[in-house]
Amino acid sequence: ADNHARVAGPRAVASGRYATEKAFLQMMTRGSCGLPCHENRRCGWACYCDDGICKPLRV
């Protein structure tokens, strides 16, 4: 198992995992718009990389 999980305890791990998933979901939607982007860091599906900044796609 993971050493960090044993140290933090199951409740902390669960809340940490929830926060990570929530952040990931925000990143995958419009949450990533406005963030810097480059070749290795792409924007979420609702955004595109324009001049180094994630901008919302016009639908």
Swiss-Prot record:
Molecular function terms from GO: toxin activity
Prodomain positions: 1-30
Organism: Crassispira cerithina
GO cellular component terms, A-Z: extracellular region
Keywords: Disulfide bond, Neurotoxin, Secreted, Toxin
Functional description taken from the UniProt entry: Crassispirid snail peptide that induces sleep-like symptoms in young mice (12 and 14 days) and hyperactivity in older mice (16 days), when intracranially injected.
Protein name: Crassipeptide cce9a
Record comment regarding domains: The cysteine framework is IX (C-C-C-C-C-C).
Main location (coarse class): secreted
Additional facts recorded: Negative results: has no activity on N-methyl-D-aspartate (NMDA) receptors.
Tissue: Expressed by the venom duct.
Superkingdom of origin: Eukaryota
Organism classification: Eukaryota, Metazoa, Spiralia, Lophotrochozoa, Mollusca
